[in-house]
Amino acid sequence: MDQQPIQVIGGGLAGTEAAWQIAQAGVPVILHEMRPKRFSPAHHTEHLAELVCSNSFGAMASDRAAGLLHEELRQLGSVVIAKADEHAVPAGGALAVDRGQFGQDLTQTLASHPLVEFRRSEVPAIPEGIVVLATGPLTSPDLAADLHRFTGMEYMSFFDAASPIIVGDSINRDIAFMASRYDKGEAAYLNCPMNKEQYLRFREELCKAEQTELKDFERETAKFFEACLPIEELAQRGEDTMRYGPVKPVGLSDSRTGERPYAVVQLRQEDKAGQLWNMVGFQTNLRWGEQKRVFQMIPGLEKAEFVRLGVMHRNTFINAPQLMLPTLQFKQRPTLLAAGQLIGTEGYTAAAAGGWLAGTNAARLALGKEPLALPPTTMLGALLEFISSASPKHFQPMPPNFGILPDLGMKIKSKPERYGRYRDRSLADLSSWKHNLN
């Protein structure tokens, strides 16, 4: 008897990873993606795993939370991280990718797998059978309504924003200089330096600039994810807030003058050719005309050409602690699994990681095996333990971080040493866990 295919709904990072893991386990899978027939407010291409915000997966070093999760996923055979490594662009200590090549390659890789059936169609309701929901924070209205009926719970939400992207040739290289903070790695960022007068004038105009209006129901519940605040929100919080955030000058000096600027706007390479540059930390909800006016006040960007201006969108997520198990199964229907931002994990790497486990467990269910939960001493295990056991009343999206890992059982004052111990324990426990899998 032919095996029934597992259905994965959503072709983002989580869904792409889930579908790949299912197929690699020898189980047929149908991957549904509604683009290009229908686009969400944040998507622009029909490629799988489109990166709608930054092109960075975070720090590469494995003694950083994101970097540790990268390394765990490499050990687990993640296709998303493998392709990110393959299409990496210079970004100092971060893993950033050429988003066009990255998305195209993943699309071709999935479409060419003999056990993957790729359907460009919208799914209006949760199907029967084994299903992985990976529809992200911008789930289509019909499916969102069906999920609401299934859970009997209201969605939670926050607002997320994307940064502008600039044509490299339009940046004044007589002003902007190449460097990485603390000279880590190769000089990978373009840095636009500001003196105090320029910074204060820029902040003043940023605070006065017109924003895109939120709808009434959005304004009443407006809540931002703290790690992705609009730059204008930071500017309004205080004179020096931006200088302790995205425009902090520490670790940077202009080699031409030997001086440390008062503030620095960093641009990160978007593509391998170096033709496109992303304004790091400049997520924004300003009107498009205002973005051009204010951002062209930045030294070196006076004639900047924008290929994409910043946008903001509302992200919804379910109350995972009430609904989910650490295996990423729904408590009330174990054959329904979910991953990605829909369940409240935050960030690209966390989405791919959740997709890995959801896909792996969906395949195990189809093969008559018990679903897996990762050791809580690993970054992925700790993250999924958190989202399935946090306080439902106060649940908010969570990125990978060392604060969710179990205590080491010893006091280590040095942060680098402490994080190194977390890393060593995590990778050792993951290796042992993998060795004992059946």
From Swiss-Prot:
Entries under PROSITE patterns matching the protein: GIDA_2
Leader sequence residues: none
Domain of life of the native organism: Bacteria
Catalytic activity: uridine(54) in tRNA + (6R)-5,10-methylene-5,6,7,8-tetrahydrofolate + NADH + H(+) = 5-methyluridine(54) in tRNA + (6S)-5,6,7,8-tetrahydrofolate + NAD(+); uridine(54) in tRNA + (6R)-5,10-methylene-5,6,7,8-tetrahydrofolate + NADPH + H(+) = 5-methyluridine(54) in tRNA + (6S)-5,6,7,8-tetrahydrofolate + NADP(+)
Top-level class of the enzyme under EC nomenclature: transferase
Cell compartments where the protein resides: Cytoplasm
Alphabetical list of SUPFAM superfamilies matching this protein: FAD/NAD(P)-binding domain (SSF51905)
Pfam family, one: GIDA
UniProt EC number: 2.1.1.74
GO molecular function, one term: flavin adenine dinucleotide binding
Binding site for FAD: G10, G11, G12, L13, A14, G15
GO CC term (a single one): cytosol
An example Gene Ontology biological process: tRNA methylation
Main subcellular location: cytoplasm
Cofactor(s) required for function per UniProt: FAD
Keyword tags: Cytoplasm, FAD, Flavoprotein, Methyltransferase, NAD, NADP, Transferase, tRNA processing
Alphabetical list of InterPro entries matching this protein: FAD/NAD-bd_sf (IPR036188), MnmG-rel (IPR002218), MnmG-rel_CS (IPR020595), MnmG_N (IPR040131), TrmFO (IPR004417)
Family: Belongs to the MnmG family. TrmFO subfamily.
Described purpose of this protein according to its UniProt entry: Catalyzes the folate-dependent formation of 5-methyl-uridine at position 54 (M-5-U54) in all tRNAs.
PANTHER family in the cross-refs: GLUCOSE INHIBITED DIVISION PROTEIN A, METHYLENETETRAHYDROFOLATE--TRNA-(URACIL-5-)-METHYLTRANSFERASE TRMFO
HAMAP family according to UniProt: TrmFO
Protein name in the entry: Methylenetetrahydrofolate--tRNA-(uracil-5-)-methyltransferase TrmFO
Biological source species: Trichormus variabilis (strain ATCC 29413 / PCC 7937) (Anabaena variabilis)
Upper lineage: Bacteria, Bacillati, Cyanobacteriota, Cyanophyceae, Nostocales
Gene giving rise to this polypeptide: trmFO
